[in-house]
């Protein structure tokens, strides 16, 4: 089943947090701790999705189980079906950014290391607010401020959303295979 890109909703109901397969800095937990009060204030559900290599899962699972308004999914594989209900994302600067773009979900992007800092797709012109790369001990106090602005400033969120609508990555795999096949034919 192909997921359909999201339509803009006037009020934010859900934010998704996802930081890749390993989340080496435990940003799932750190960011959740920073945003949970803002989300509670505006009645925004938090959906946390962690990858198969995430070592902090047990600790985060215990935290989440004691709280309402939050869910935790682990090692999901394809994440786009989970994204269908999200209005905003907070993520690292990897492949997930492209899935978010395809699904029309604006977000806050936190590069987890220098290599992710070199990825240039996540920027305001493409619907994302890119922060400085995370370094151990960084306070991340900007995250709840940016999130609250996205929740209450519909015009700004809509601007980011509308910049995402042009992205559709559905046919990419087939286009790539077609080009490879073309090159093979050309060589004969």
Where on the chain are the PLM-derived regions?
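Nucleotide-activated sugar donor-binding and catalytic core shared by glycosyltransferases
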Residues: 1-188
């Amino acid at each position: 089943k192909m997921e359909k890109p999201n339509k803009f909703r006037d009020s934010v109901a859900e934010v998704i947090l996802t930081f890749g397969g390993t989340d080496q800095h435990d940003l799932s937990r750190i960011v959740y701790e920073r945003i949970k009060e803002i989300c509670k204030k505006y009645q925004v559900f938090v959906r946390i999705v962690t990858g198969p290599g995430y070592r902090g899962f047990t600790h985060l699972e215990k935290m989440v189980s004691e709280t309402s308004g939050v869910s935790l999914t682990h090692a999901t594989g394809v994440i786009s079906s989970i994204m269908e209900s999200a209005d905003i994302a907070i993520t690292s600067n990897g492949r997930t950014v492209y899935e978010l773009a395809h699904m029309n979900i604006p977000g806050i992007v936190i590069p987890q290391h220098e290599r992710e800092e070199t990825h240039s797709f996540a920027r305001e012109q493409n619907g994302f607010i890119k922060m400085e790369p995370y370094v151990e001990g960084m306070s991340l106090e900007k995250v709840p401020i940016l999130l609250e602005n996205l929740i209450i400033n519909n015009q700004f969120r809509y601007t980011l959303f509308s910049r995402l609508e042009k992205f559709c990555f559905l046919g990419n795999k087939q286009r790539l295979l077609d080009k490879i096949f073309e090159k093979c034919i050309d060589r004969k």
